[in-house]
Amino acid sequence: MPTSCYIDKATSTIVGAYFDKQETLNGYYHLFYQILTNYGIPYKLFTDNRTVFNYMSLNPDKRTSDKDVLTQYGYACKQLGIELETSSISQTKGLIERTNGTFQGRLINELKLNGITTINDANKYLIEIFVPDFNKRFAMDYKKFESVFETSPSLDKINYTLAVLTPRKIDNGNSIKYYGKYYQPYLDQELKCFAPKTECLVIKAFNGELLVTIDEQVLDLENYPEMKDFLKNLIMF
């Protein structure tokens, strides 16, 4: 269970921390959510060169388009006007590595002492208890410094900005297959029909809500049962 965190360079304040099974977009979106809701919009995020931050580190064969040089994380930053800078230079990681050493050493001991064994309980303890206490002990009071954070966006804006975008096509049954399930597009509770192979973009919001954009329209997605499940519910005459 890697621990990821963001640190305010000026005050050494941990502004976000999160446990996940591996370092992926999901974990970093949870970090981003903490920053946006608790502190506001930062001027700049400085990260390493891992793929979740730097699209150009992908093998060219795995890129969706040579013109698309932003990761989804980078796209979210752009939408909020945040500068995203990446680097592989080790000396730039000194503050984070020093903080992580103290951070993880104390955290592991506290999780053991409190009998915490699940990732959900670990995140609850990390966010609600450990980070506030850690900042009180080791960081300067960020409120005493001139803030470079802009006002927090609305929760709705955060929810739709921290989204996962996935290209799809409408099939012959006017449905979209997304992670093994079928969905159909609706607008104001009315089914909308499109030609087969129409390109679309599925939007999974931070809260799990699914939407789709088709022909510059934003539509709701409703789960559509697979045919074998549909046939089970037919009444035979």
Where are these regions (language model features)?
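Active-site-proximal structural scaffolding
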Residues: 66-70, 127, 195
